[in-house]
Amino acid sequence: MIYGIGTDIVSLKRIVRLSKKFGQAFAERILTPEELLEFPQAGKPVNYLAKRFAAKEAFAKAVGTGIRGAVSFRNIGIGHDALGKPEFFYAPALSKWLEEQGISRVSLSMSDEEDTVLAFAVAEK
C-alpha cells in the first residue's frame, strides 16, 4: 500500500552556488560517509550532489516528515543495484524509524537534464 510520494527538482546552478559558498562543508552536510568516499571519483560532481540532494528531499516528502530527526541527509544514502537502478540505503537510526512507522520500502527514480535534476520517491507500508 502506498504511504506517500515525494518529488524534488533541483537546479544545477543552485548546487554550484552552494558548493562555491560552503565548499566541502556542503558535501559533508548532504552526503553519507559512504557517499563522501565516492564523491571525489564522480565524473560530474555537481550532478552527483544535486541528484543526492533531490533524492533525499523526495524521500523526506514521501515519508511525510521533511528533513528532521532520523530523516536526515546523513542518514539517507543513495546507491544502485546490480542493474544500475537507484535505490535508498539507510543508517541504523533511520532503519529503526522506518520500521516503527511501518514503512517497508521507499522506491526511487531520478532523471537529469542539462541544468536540472528530478527525483521521485514512493514510500510503501
Swiss-Prot record:
Gene designation per UniProt: acpS
Keyword annotations from UniProtKB, A to Z: Cytoplasm, Fatty acid biosynthesis, Fatty acid metabolism, Lipid biosynthesis, Lipid metabolism, Magnesium, Metal-binding, Transferase
Binding site for Mg(2+): 8, 57
Free-text function comment from the UniProt entry: Transfers the 4'-phosphopantetheine moiety from coenzyme A to a Ser of acyl-carrier-protein.
Record Gene3D superfamilies: 4'-phosphopantetheinyl transferase domain
A GO biological-process term: fatty acid biosynthetic process
Family: Belongs to the P-Pant transferase superfamily. AcpS family.
A GO MF term: holo-[acyl-carrier-protein] synthase activity
Chief place where the protein resides: cytoplasm
Catalysis: reaction(s): apo-[ACP] + CoA = holo-[ACP] + adenosine 3',5'-bisphosphate + H(+)
Stated name of the protein: Holo-[acyl-carrier-protein] synthase
Keyword Transit peptide part of the UniProt annotation: no
Enzyme Commission code: 2.7.8.7
